[in-house]
UniProtKB/Swiss-Prot annotation:
NCBIfam families: PRK11727.1. Its main location: cytoplasm. It comes from the Bacteria. One of its GO terms (molecular function) is 23S rRNA (adenine(1618)-N(6))-methyltransferase activity. It is found in: Cytoplasm. The lineage of its organism: Bacteria, Pseudomonadati, Pseudomonadota, Gammaproteobacteria, Pseudomonadales. Residues 1-31 are annotated as: Disordered. Belongs to the methyltransferase superfamily. METTL16/RlmF family. Its EC number is 2.1.1.181. One of its GO terms (biological process) is rRNA base methylation. This is Ribosomal RNA large subunit methyltransferase F.
């Protein structure tokens, strides 16, 4: 007997949401920004953020990271909610950094110092850190002091950045923990900056990574295309997180800047226990490692980091042997 019943009608399927991309790398275990951002918590702390919250293609709350004002307000909320920084702002067109990645650099530096301290992370005001190119945002000193209680000296060649960083420091009552100073000679990095009696346990640096303004602008175009924001009819801001020219490019690009930093560090071998710098491209490592060999560094470390889909790294080097590197 033939079954003449019609098969049950299938319900039309709703279009599936795109699958969220799988993370290729994770943040440092001590990083405060694991997983998705708690926007309810952030908005409770900083109500102004509510106006900038959107739903991304995966149905998750986010912000438009191509909007400089949104990124600035978002950073302000993160700093207030997670680090107790109640007052933070930067001038227009200055670098507005992604905080989780900046925090990772500091956590891995803390691990590096722990290796010379019987595995214990050194904390407190006895630990001195030098932030080369601290910028108007003063982000590394703010995070490093909040997480580890370290004392910071920040340097910059830009008087506007120095003024903005000073305002942030004073507004948050951190003048005893963080100070900033201007490098008056734009051709020097460390030379002429430090007093001969000063000693630091670690230095850190986020170097300019382009060799020219044109190269920086091409990099901006690539980033905006990736964000789906490129519009050939209008002038784009230089990179989606802002940035003044001296923050983004210098003669010789990243390799040129880091090579100069290495050469100058060799003239001050005992004033900083561990020198370090971010390196934006893995392909830049061989010439940097060659420069370190020529400079006579006793030990060199390349530390890989990762934030979601982004891979990053920093190079650390020292001219001191193990016995000379005790943190206290």
């Amino acid at each position: 007997m033939t079954d003449t019943r019609k098969p049950p009608r299938k319900k039309p399927q709703r279009p599936a949401k795109p699958a969220a991309p799988r993370e290729k790398a994770t943040l440092h275990p001590r990083n405060r920004h694991q997983g998705h951002y708690d926007f309810a918590k952030l908005i409770k702390s900083s109500p102004e953020l509510a106006a900038f919250v959107i739903l991304n293609p995966y149905g998750k709350e986010s912000i438009d990271f191509a909007d400089p004002q949104a990124v600035r307000v978002f950073n302000r909320a993160l700093l207030k909610a997670f680090y107790g920084i109640a007052h933070w702002d930067i001038p227009a067109d200055y670098l507005c950094p992604p905080i989780p990645g900046r925090a990772d650099y500091l956590h891995f530096l803390a691990d590096l110092l722990a290796e010379d301290n019987e595995g214990v992370i050194p904390r407190g005001a006895s630990i001195k850190a030098l932030d080369i190119g601290t910028g108007a945002n003063c982000i590394y000193p703010l995070l490093g002091h909040s997480d580890y209680g370290w004392q910071f000296v920040g340097s910059d060649i830009d008087s506007t950045a120095i003024a903005a960083a000073t305002t942030i420091i004073k507004a948050n009552g951190l003048s005893k923990a963080i100070s900033v100073r201007q490098q008056d000679n734009r051709k020097q990095i460390l030379l002429g900056l430090l007093d001969s009696s000063e000693r630091f346990h670690v230095s850190l640096c986020n170097p300019p990574f382009h060799a020219s303004l044109d190269e920086a602008q091409r990099g901006s175009q690539r980033k905006w295309r990736a964000l789906g924001k490129a519009d050939p009819k209008r002038k784009l801001p230089v990179l989606n997180f802002g940035g003044q020219s001296q923050e983004l490019w210098c003669e010789g690009g990243e390799i040129g800047f880091v090579t100069r930093l290495i050469q100058e560090s060799a003239t001050l071998p005992s004033q900083v226990v561990w020198f370090s710098t971010l390196v934006s491209k893995a392909s830049n490592l061989p010439p940097i490692q060659n420069a370190l060999k020529k400079a006579g560094a006793l030990e060199v470390k390349v530390i890989e980091m990762g934030q979601g889909q982004k891979q990053s790294r920093f190079v650390a080097w020292t001219f001191l042997d193990k016995a000379q590197r005790t943190p206290h």
